[in-house]
Structures are given as structure tokens and as C-alpha cells.
Amino acid sequence: MNNFKYLLVGLAIFNFISCQNKPSLQSEYVEGNALGTSYHINFYSEKSENWEQGFDSIFEVVNKSMSTYLPNSDISKINKGNKDVKVDQMFREVFNLSKEIYANTDGYFDPTVGNLVNAYGFGAEELNELTEKDLDSLVSLVGFKDFYLTEENHIQKPNKNSYLEFNAIAKGYTVDRLAVYLESQGVENYL
């Protein structure tokens, strides 16, 4: 009989604990434009807040660092020949990851093809009429192996006309930063 009392008390405690109010998750949906495209983010959160402000701050920092479409971004300054630009942590991470991918693909992934991309009208500049000589000249500027990150966090490039762009990797990197932000806010499920 004593065991039965303990069982009833245990079940009552379990029932009380399991029926307590848990914070309810709210479905959140945020959409907008950034990095030259649109984005849509679905997630569940216990708190309702101005999520756009947090997302926009991430987009702003990424753009300031790596957008070839913004003339005052760090990468645009580097592409114009400014050797004094001290790159931030995000730029360094993307640069080093690009070096790794460049090596693992035997150079097929190369973030220095920007001059060619622009010449064909796919980048930040307008399409130009190209001769074979022009193409040869542009191809000679391609080669990520000759770019270096110095200990002082400056980019050393082989030719003042070499052009660096992370468009093939920056959007994915930004998604990773958004995920870190959401998780830091207690969000576990997001898309």
C-alpha cells in the first residue's frame, strides 16, 4: 500500500510539471532584398521582436566588407588598388575559405575572375566589346594563388588591375552568419 501512495504522489508531481505553461513558439516570416537578391526567412521564436533590424545589420556589415557593387566597400577599394585597407574578420574568413576551395578544386573555383565577369556584362560593370587581345589581357589577371592576406590584415595582390570578388561564396557565408544570429537569439528551427 505504501508503494501505491508513492506511485500516486510521483504521478501527481509528473503531471503537474508536464502541464505547466511552456513558452509558446510564434511562427515568424521575414522577407526583403539584400545582396542583389531577395530573401525569405521562416522560423519559430519565443519572442517577438524587430528581426529585420538584426538581419539588416548583418547584411550591412557583409556589404561594407565584400560587395563589389558598393564603391566604398573594402573589396571595391582593394580592387581599385588601395593597399591600406585593413580587412575585417568576415573578409578574412571568406578569403581563407576561398583559398581552401581554390586549392581543393585545383583552381576551378577562382574569385579573381571578376574582370572577365565584368567584361561579359555579368558583374557590376557594363558589357564591353571584346577583342581576343582584350580577353588575353584579362585572363592574365586571373589567379587567386597570387593573392595573399598579410599579417597586418591587408590584401596583397599581384597586379594593380587584378580583381577580387566573392560573389560565389558571400551569399552562403551570409546565410551562415544569419544562422549564428538566430541561434544566439534562441531560435532553433529556421529556413
Where does each model-flagged region fall?
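Bacterial N-terminal signal peptides that target proteins for export
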Residues: 1-7
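Bacterial N-terminal signal peptides
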Residues: 8-15
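A contiguous, well-ordered beta/alpha segment that forms the leading edge of an enzyme domain
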Residues: 16-167, 180-191
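Short, conserved phosphate/pyrophosphate- and ester-handling motifs at nucleotide-, phospho-/glycolipid
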Residues: 171
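Short active-site segment of divalent metal-dependent hydrolases/proteases
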Residues: 174
